[in-house]
């Protein structure tokens, strides 16, 4: 959603050519009609640029002309489409799910897409994905950057913390400000299995500074007061961001539900 909002702003305020690459052509088509089109319609400035009548139906397809901007949604499994479209903004979405055959060699989807920005003085290249493994593309790209984490204020002491899983569950480098997710230690049975109901009821994040229990009801206000901070130097001009679902303030992403999902993996 954040990336879509950023691209929408560019289209409205800084007309651009955009290449949005998804794992497959089918996903690109679906994303265009079910995820992207609602963003355009919700914006009065962008909605007025959408064609009317019969042309509006064709507009929902993978190539769209929005005012002076052009946006193309393509699949990583279509090298010909990737190689023929210059773009100032390239979004590589869910790169860890790109087919193996589209990685490496002449048909490398990531390389082909990034080459499309060469003719622009101020290109933007964005890669995003849910990490799948430590040697996966998105994780390696994150490590090359300045590894920004979202610091939020503790609702009790006000000091900034990072919501995180305990060290034994993650390969992320520690910042020293982690508010680790914890639950009742007695939720683990003598046979090593977990009482998942007890885990869900007791899960919370613990402030490393004042030891306060951070609850789901605190998330919204904490997020509003948060700020992105780099935790490494990274390559010059290379920003990378990590934001786990622990920050999401929805009924599906409570500390308890996420802890249960985590333990069931």
State each model region's role:
Residues 1-265:
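Phosphate/NTP-binding elements of NTP-utilizing enzymes
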């Amino acid at each position: 959603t954040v990336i879509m909002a950023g691209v929408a702003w560019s289209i409205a305020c800084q007309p651009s050519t955009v290449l949005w690459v998804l794992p497959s052509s089918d996903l690109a088509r679906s994303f265009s009609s079910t995820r992207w089109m609602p963003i355009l319609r919700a914006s009065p400035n962008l909605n007025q640029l959408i064609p009317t009548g019969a042309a509006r139906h064709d507009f929902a397809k993978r190539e769209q002309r929005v005012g002076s901007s052009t946006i193309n949604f393509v699949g990583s499994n279509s090298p010909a489409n990737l190689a023929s479209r210059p773009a100032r903004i390239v979004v590589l979405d869910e790169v860890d799910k790109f087919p193996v055959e589209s990685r490496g060699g002449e048909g490398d989807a990531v390389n082909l897409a990034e080459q499309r920005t060469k003719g622009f003085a101020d290109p933007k290249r964005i890669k995003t994905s849910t990490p799948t493994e430590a040697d996966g593309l998105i994780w390696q790209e994150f490590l090359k950057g300045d590894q920004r984490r979202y610091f939020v204020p503790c609702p009790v002491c006000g000091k900034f913390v990072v919501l995180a899983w305990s060290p034994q569950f993650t390969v992320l480098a520690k910042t020293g400000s982690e508010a680790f997710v914890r639950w009742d230690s007695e939720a683990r049975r003598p046979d090593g299995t977990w009482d998942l109901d007890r885990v869900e009821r007791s899960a919370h994040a613990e402030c490393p500074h004042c030891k306060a229990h951070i609850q789901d009801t605190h998330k919204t206000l904490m997020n509003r007061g948060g700020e992105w901070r780099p935790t490494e130097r990274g390559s010059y001009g290379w920003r990378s961001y990590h934001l786990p679902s622990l920050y999401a303030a929805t009924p599906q992403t409570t500390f308890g539900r996420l802890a249960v999902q985590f333990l069931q993996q």
